[in-house]
Amino acid sequence: MAGSLPTAVLGRTNLEVTKLGFGAMEIRGGPRGRDITSAQAENILNAVLDSGINYIDTSIDYGQSEEFIGQFISSRRDEYFLASKCGCAVGAPVAPPGTRSPHVFTKENIVAGVEQSLRRMKTDYLDVVQFHSSPSKQMLEEHGAVEALADLQQQGKVRHLGMSGTLPNLPEQIDMGVFDVLQIPYSAMERPHETLISQAAKVGIGNVIRGGVAKGEPGQSGVPRPDPWKTFESAGLDELMDDGESPTDFLLRFTLSHPGMHTTIVGTLNPDH
């Protein structure tokens, strides 16, 4: 399935994933993302699979992303592992740019969200479903959220439970012992979770890295820093680049070098990338 691209086993899931995955947030469209046509979405999704990439990550609150996946590559479902998220309030209006979507971790909302994702993406199962927005252990237990996802797993609709985790809740999420996959932000410009990635890998958790190229080459829009170039240079990262290497290439190389990572998801609308 993985073609000639480098692969890794995603922890105890035993899924052999390409070390480069596709972050389908890039095809969400407006108002929270760049406008996109159906033709663009079809082109990039098929280019991703044609290149050999076999891990696609999306979410129920990524605009048109799930619908595009169902419309354009559901017929190629045996070529990729599909990960989505749960916890976003089903039926809530799209949150304006710069704000977060509401999250509800009740059993009813978890089930409704997964069922919606299955319909949208025209598939009978999801390889990974991750809790969105890094909820605390207390919040998950209060609403029976993990049990809801485990029930869906027993029904064959979800293969592996995951968490899109960040500090301060990431350590307890690792210790809970129920998550097969963690999605964690990490790059040369964002390293607070570095040791936790190693800790998760040691206990058999599969690590999916997001933000591995810091949401784009420094200097491009979307990097959450006032002056990304200044941040990149002040950290001395430009001095570590190989001859002819772009900042994006360096950031990706750095992320891929972490021994505890298994795949890093990167988004683009340009098939040449």
Language model features with spans:
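Conserved, mostly hydrophobic/aromatic
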Residues: 10, 22, 48, 56, ...
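Active-site mouth loops of central-metabolism enzymes
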Residues: 26-39, 96-111, 138, 237-242
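Active-site groove signature of glycoside hydrolases
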Residues: 116-137
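Short, well-ordered coil/turn segments that N-cap beta-strands
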Residues: 15-20, 51-54, 77-80, 123-127, ...
